Amino acid sequence: MPILRRALGLAPVLLLSLAGCSRSDPATDLKTEPLEIRVLSNRADLVSGDDALVELVGIGDDWTVDVDGRDVTGAFARRDNGRVLGRIEGLAAGANVVTLKQGSQGARLTITNHPSSGPIIAGAQLQPWDCTTTDAGLEAAADATTCTAPVLYEFFYKSTAGGSFRAYDPENPPTDVATTTTDQGKSVPYIIRQETGTQNRGIYTLAVLFDPAQGWEPWAPQSAWNGKLHYPFGASCGTNHTQGSAQNVQDDLALSRGFMVASSSLNELGHACNTWLSAESVMMLKEHIVDRYGEIRYTMAEGCSGGSIGQHMVGNNYPGLLQGIQPNCSYMDNWSTGLEVIDCHLLLNYTQNGGLVTPALFGKVSGHQGMSSCVAWEGLFAPVVDPEGGCGASSGNGEYNAATNPAGCRGSVQDYNVGVLGKRSAELWDDSPSADTRAAEALVGGFARFAYDNTGVQYGLEALLDGAITAVQFVDLNQKIGSVDVDFNFTPGRRTADPGTELLYRAGGINDAAQLDGVAIIDLRGTSNAEIHTDYHSWGMRARLDKANGHHDNQLIWTFASSLVVPPSIGELSFVTLDAWLAAVEADTGPGTREQKIARNKPAAAVDQCFTSDASAPPERDMARCATLYPYYGSPRLVAGMPITHDNGACQKKPLVREDYGSVIFTDAQWATLASVFPDGVCDWSKPPQLWSPSVPWLTHDGAGGVALGEPPRSTALSGP
């Protein structure tokens, strides 16, 4: 049955120069503004690829610009929109000092340039790493270290006969090209240009309506592009040490309306389960778009399962990269979701090895509709926690095995994120019961820190209090469930999280939603209680928004009967609604924060609702009725008493007290057993996690823990000869 006991900030950093936040209007009187150099591509300290789109503000007609003494004045001109814009190319690695001079006045700004192959903010890059450019239709990588290859441009079109996109040859154009009318009212031939290239050791793809007979400059984009970007994120959670492949960007719903569609293989969480790497890749790809195609009005995203995690995490931890998101079959983050994966692993092991909680009662202690959800978690994602699950690289020393290949590539999600988590210190290397694991860790100088903790967790507590299981079963379960070590071996005792893993809170690994109120959210919840995409995760994110910000005015939840696939009519309604919502926020020039503008500019359709299986019926907006139509369940930690926020990875403790169990009677022997299982007490869910701290946006992970970037650099004024 559904879980009945539920406990239902920080302002985002202002990113004035962040790529893709908005297009500026031409200045009405440039000479009244102070001289200023503005990098439009990205923050000036995070530029990559040796170039940057730059605006000069407040200048007249006689001025010069140089980069470290190299004259680049010729790159700039007053464009048709009235703004002085130019693309500075040939930036050196590291600091580049840009100086603007006009008479006795001037401005100076340092642009910090990083390689297009990364890294910038996500920390040290993993090794080994296989280049797979030829799988994406590109030439073989010119450099096996950076996996770079020349860009590929292709044209496709929609035929008047319908169907999918077809190859288009500009030298021999077909005669059956369809026409599309964009959301700006422009009717154009339905031809797109698709660009595929390498960036950040991944592979990106982007597509946009494109007339092959016309030019395109970032200060003069072709008119069919509406200036908006649609960004799909990929599903699942995987730890492959390869480039992978990007999402299909031939999205008719978006392209036909004039959107650009873009994504990177590193936004495929099923390929690369590192959300900091995903954010870095979004940032770099958007910078490339601004440099080559022009400023982005706003970016709206979509994605199911792991794709929802990518959206939630990028939106919260790097505010300004995404303005609106459409998470589908959603989760709040991958780290708190990992609690459910490992808890299920332990519960299945307990039940299958003679535990007194039988399969018939399994759902009562797991919080699920039945046993199938944990079985699915075990089959799909236990290998992602197991370092012997494989990392998908053919290069390097092969895959890890504690006994036979201790120096091999470890495929666990924590090892995939070692650049953020850091390594376990030497005093922990003997905490495994496996001699092979202990020897392997000592050989390589420490594995990645492991954040899993189940000390104090009373598995099955709600089931006990509800009378679904007995005191005998409750004691047996908690005595025997045990835990896992850093190599995913079963251990008889409970596990304490490795010291240092509390940095996951600061780094936003466990998503506190503190910055997420600056993002418009339509959560598309296909009801699915028989497998892993259980419904409570949508409501858990709502609870986190409420906890962090005191409201959830920026989040809608739309529930429907199908599980993973959004019905096309609902998908289109969500797309159009989110677009209208963001356009209204963009047009709101009144006072107030972005968060306030999101709350006050909702379209009429931007409300919570559910859709019945009757396609002809109007959506139901009585949420009590929706809860009856689509009940939602929980997780092992919710049954253990954690609030629906599901955000406590390592709980503070309280004493074990008989009175906390109501009418449940324990024998003295049972009580003694519980006391031995919980020597430090049981979880006090009313308190924050151990060593909790709020998330800090815009961290750069050039070492475990991360460093806050702070406000974007701005140019400084110069005066004198």
What are these regions (language model features)?
Residues 17-20:
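C-terminal motif of bacterial Sec signal peptides marking the signal peptidase cleavage site
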Residues 27-304, 308-721:
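C-terminal His-loop and adjacent cap/lid subdomain of alpha/beta-hydrolase
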Residues 22-24:
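Bacterial signal peptide processing site
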Residues 1-10:
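Bacterial N-terminal signal peptides that target proteins for export
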